[in-house]
Amino acid sequence: MRVALVAGEHSGDRLGAGLIRAIRARCPEAEFDGVGGPLMQAEGLRSHYPMEALSVMGLVEVLRHLPRLLRIRRDLVARYRTDPPDVFVGIDLPDFNLSIERRLKAVGVPTVHYVSPQVWAWRQGRVRTIGRSVDRILALYPFEAEFYRRHGVPVDFVGHPAADRFPLQPDAGAARAALGLVDDGGGPWVALLPGSRLGEVQRHAELYARTVARLRERQPDVRFIAPLAWPGLRAVFYEALVQQGVSDAVQLFEGRADEVMAAADVVLTASGTATLEAMLLKRPMVVAYRLAPLTFWLMKRLVRVSHVSQPNLLAGEGLVEEYLQDAATPDNLAYALYRLLNDEPRSAYLRARFAELHGTLRRGADGQAAAAVLAAAGGNGS
């Protein structure tokens, strides 16, 4: 049994690692190759390219790197047509992976797409292309599965692996102890998550640093912690803190985002996977996000949903405050954080709703996804 997988960012690398583990538990002789990051490689994936070569976000940013992306795509298609795997799994990265899946399905390779493209949010006409490109969609969220069923696309709602990983009752005290934070009854902790990609952190660093300064003016005893996934991100963020004169107010960590959020009373985060993880950790949050101006202009005209953060999409309502583009100002963010820090009934309500949403996603996702992938491979496995 040979499984080809392609992931292009950290969240996909984590999903892919769990999937590989679960497939190997059922099929010990399975082999894995494709494109993945350190987590997938640690589970045995042979990666033909560095995952970072595919880690590009936003319409403008994709155009800048298009020649490289097309070259890698051509190579992968040629490689898997010449030496077909038993099944191909594209993990997220829809504009890249769906084109590979369509070409491989046309020559008889079973194809699975893990993580639904956001067709329910924008470019809904893509659902027909998806149906022609994949044998099965593995959806992380129930509303996604409902959308595909309405359009006649085979789909499994597998749940979200993060919902299985995070405890239903997180322990803030244990997280603070693990991070070496002094839990001395002082001021509240605010976690800052400006993003996991360089472009995101570059766009958000000054905004978040100025927000720290504004919030300290309102509530001087607030303490700040921030996880940055790698040293380059840390350097960009630290420079912004220095320029705003608040570098002494923020304790930086390399990685450890889960622990940092668990240790916090309130989280300020960019949109994306971090909003889901903050929800699973039952942490009240404020969401702030900026895109490249042209990308935002285009997205405003294409997107068909009212919310961008995972808690709001899951709940179907505006549970958490979202500040996007021009609305993401230091004054707005500082005031939103101040209100959350000083409104315990609201925070308690959010924690209770987050616990309900957590339960809907807790389904043993790695195992369910592995079973679906092996079923798609059918008699092709050995």
UniProtKB/Swiss-Prot annotation:
It catalyses: a lipid X + a UDP-2-N,3-O-bis[(3R)-3-hydroxyacyl]-alpha-D-glucosamine = a lipid A disaccharide + UDP + H(+). Pathway: Bacterial outer membrane biogenesis; LPS lipid A biosynthesis. It is an enzyme of class 2 (transferase). InterPro entries: Glyco_trans_19 (IPR003835). One of its GO terms (biological process) is lipid A biosynthetic process. Keywords: Glycosyltransferase, Lipid A biosynthesis, Lipid biosynthesis, Lipid metabolism, Transferase. Signal peptide: none annotated. GO terms for molecular function: lipid-A-disaccharide synthase activity; phospholipid binding. Its EC number is 2.4.1.182. Gene3D superfamilies: Glycogen Phosphorylase B. GO terms for cellular component: membrane. The keyword Lipid biosynthesis applies. Belongs to the LpxB family. Condensation of UDP-2,3-diacylglucosamine and 2,3-diacylglucosamine-1-phosphate to form lipid A disaccharide, a precursor of lipid A, a phosphorylated glycolipid that anchors the lipopolysaccharide to the outer membrane of the cell. This is Lipid-A-disaccharide synthase. The gene is lpxB.
